[in-house]
Amino acid sequence: GGPGHSFLEANLVVEEMAAFCGPTGRIVVEGNMGAISAILHYGTESQRRMAAEMVLAGDKPAICITEPDAGSAASQMTTRADKRGDKYIVNGKKHWITGGGVSRLHLIFARVFDEGGNEQGIGGFLAIRDEAKGLRIGAREPTMGLRGIPETEVFFEDLEISADMVLMPPSGFKRGFADLMNAYNSQRVGAGTVALGLAVGGYRNALAFAQEREQFGRPIAEFQGLQW
């Protein structure tokens, strides 16, 4: 399925989208290079099928990683998933979650503890927002730009995750975080592409204005101060 574009071609399309509307470019990146990438890499057949069906229905999965005290240093997250029988109980808080309030499928990162309280590493857990008890969407958070795509707080209060909704890389929880992060390399490129598109759009608009606006009888684009 899909248009069959290469990764380079897809980013060229995103760049042009972002040149006109940054949020639109970012929505494409988040929907095609974010959580869905990790699910395709490490999800089971049933998990991949579930995610694909939701995306085809219009959903854009949300990635729940960032916390108030764990931004760039994401490995310092405190959200935890405690194993109880064949389930995991997730408690914690995430913020700046892109599309958190509108996405149905959430990929949640949390520290994993076995039934004896021993930490196992960091894992990924899938939850469907409107079916999950214990997943609560908080306030929409203000941003300087890209306001066309919402950023929200997400709270987990004894959220139950069944074993079949655990995203498990072959390395298990010990190296799971590193493996899952590697699955986001395409999203990192996409984020840079959106930034480049915004810069291109800004340059085009500035150039058009400088060629149209006149002072002292000629376009201001002809003045050395604007040509530097």
Where are the regions that the model predicts?
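A structural signal for short hydrophobic beta-strand segments in well-ordered beta-sheet cores
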Residues: 79-82
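Glycine-rich beta->alpha junctions and the first turn(s) of the following alpha-helix
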Residues: 124, 136-228
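Internal helix-loop-helix
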Residues: 1-58, 98-105
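A short core secondary-structure module
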Residues: 91-137
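Short glycine/proline-enriched turns and hinge-like loops at secondary-structure junctions
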Residues: 5-6, 73-75, 99-104, 118-121, ...
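A short, Trp-centered hydrophobic/proline-enriched beta-strand micro-motif
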Residues: 57-66
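Short Ser/Thr-interspersed hydrophobic loop/turn segments at strand-loop and sheet-helix junctions
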Residues: 14-18, 110, 127-132, 157-161
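Glycine-rich phosphate/pyrophosphate-binding beta-alpha loops
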Residues: 70, 95-101, 146, 187-190
